[in-house]
């Protein structure tokens, strides 16, 4: 069966289906010059194990395998290392039931009582509702 291998260039390989992924990596290494240990072979975005055969991995005729090079690194510096830290450390608190707010006539009645009925008369200049003293 034919198999397409997309590395730096697109290659067509003739395989039987009993080859291992390691053999495909060795073949790509001879074509592209990338060391087999530096290659990652992907089928539909999922990496394939070296010892698995193409048949076990579900590779069919005219499938495309992608070969990507391994990236150096591993440490994350700066603010990316702390992404999500605060949210992960914050404790989850259960929502509390709130009393239903009054609307319409009941709300107007409450406002009237607050403004005119329950007012304690004081001497001096009148102060607004947002005054700090």
From Swiss-Prot:
Family: In the N-terminal section; belongs to the ubiquitin family.
Keyword Methyltransferase: no
GO annotation, biological process: translation
GO terms assigned for molecular function: structural constituent of ribosome
Chain positions found as N6-succinyllysine: 125
One GO CC annotation: cytosolic small ribosomal subunit
Superkingdom of the source species: Eukaryota
Protein name: Ubiquitin-like FUBI-ribosomal protein eS30 fusion protein
Organism taxonomic ancestry: Eukaryota, Metazoa, Chordata, Craniata, Vertebrata
Organism per entry: Oryctolagus cuniculus
Note, other: FAU encodes a fusion protein consisting of the ubiquitin-like protein FUBI at the N terminus and ribosomal protein S30 at the C terminus.
SMART domains recorded: UBQ
Record CDD domains: Ubl_FUBI
Post-translational events: FUBI is cleaved from ribosomal protein S30 by the deubiquitinase USP36 before the assembly of ribosomal protein S30 into pre-40S ribosomal particles. FUBI removal from ribosomal protein S30 is a crucial event for the final maturation of pre-40S particles.
């Amino acid at each position: 069966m034919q198999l397409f291998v997309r590395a730096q260039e697109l290659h067509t390989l003739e395989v039987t289906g009993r080859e291992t992924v390691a053999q495909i990596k060795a073949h790509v290494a001879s074509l592209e010059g990338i060391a087999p240990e530096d290659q990652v072979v992907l089928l539909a975005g999922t990496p394939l194990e070296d010892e698995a055969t193409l048949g076990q991995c579900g590779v069919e005729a005219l499938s495309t395998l992608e070969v990507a090079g391994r990236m150096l690194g591993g440490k994350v510096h700066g603010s990316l290392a702390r992404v999500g830290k605060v949210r992960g450390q914050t404790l989850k608190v259960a929502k509390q039931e709130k009393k239903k707010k009054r609307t319409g006539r009941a709300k107007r009645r409450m406002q009237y009582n607050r403004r005119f009925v329950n007012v304690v008369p004081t001497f001096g200049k009148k102060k607004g509702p947002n005054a700090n003293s």
